[in-house]
Amino acid sequence: MKKHLPLWLFLPIFSLFGCNSEDNKANILLFATSGEYPPFEYMEQGKLQGFDIEIAQMIAQVLGKEAQFENMQFSSILPALAHGHVDAAISTITITEDRQKVFDFSQPYYFESMSAVFRKKTPIQNTEMLFQKKIACQLGTTMEIWLKKQNLKEKIITTDNNTQAIEALKAGHVDVVVMDGAQAKIFSEKNHGLSYTTIAKSEDGFGIALKKNASLTADINYALEVLSTNGKLEELQTKWLGDTTK
């Protein structure tokens, strides 16, 4: 015969588990990212690595928290943030006027150089040469925004990531891929038939995106100031990005 214990006996236990769960959430900073953009964020042996990933981890450490990540398509990052699925987003996200209407941003933590990756037999030397070329870039990036500002909208083919863009270049479907200098260097080193040159410097830096009016924005800016003052931010930039000018 089963004995039915009073429900009130279990209430403290349930309450305890509930408190632990809330405490755990309070100690975690959940970032959205897209692990398809080395050396900023990428997957290696099933683990996210890169410049942005280490910045997020150091920010969390300064704030006494643990950084965790949700890896997704770049185009899904800001919608995930808008719907409250994550606390913040770090994934080479350019601070633009349009984005600032919807989201808060941290202070910029990096200003990228824009580079043209091309086949060595058909080099690109400057921005003017792009007007005669078919151009690939990653959807929603600084490069797409910048190319449109140069009145090159009709020349652009967008891809989900730069790996797809490079494959299109190697196959001859496009003439040039415009991307960040750090990634241009990596792709050129991995593909002997390719090279790159720096064609411009972005005026809009990368920032960490947050929900509008989030109190976390001030905390993250404080952490970035700490990392800038103690030299850790510069160390990370040297470690992951090095010298990409060419």
Predicted regions and their residues:
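Ligand-binding clefts/hinges and TM-proximal coupling segments of bilobed small-molecule sensing domains
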Residues: 25, 142-160, 192-200, 224-246
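Periplasmic-binding protein-like
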Residues: 33-35, 110-118, 181, 185-225, ...
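Extended ligand-binding regions for polar small-molecule ligands
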Residues: 20, 53-62, 121-124, 128-134, ...
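Extracytoplasmic small-molecule ligand-binding "clamshell" domains
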Residues: 24-92
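A ligand-binding cleft/hinge motif common to bilobed small-molecule-binding domains
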Residues: 79, 91-101, 149, 170-202
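C-terminal motif of bacterial Sec signal peptides marking the signal peptidase cleavage site
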Residues: 16-18
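Short helix-initiation/N-cap motifs at beta->coil->alpha
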Residues: 53, 69-79, 139-142, 157-167
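A conserved helix-loop-strand patch within extracytoplasmic ligand-binding domains
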Residues: 65, 93-94, 107-155
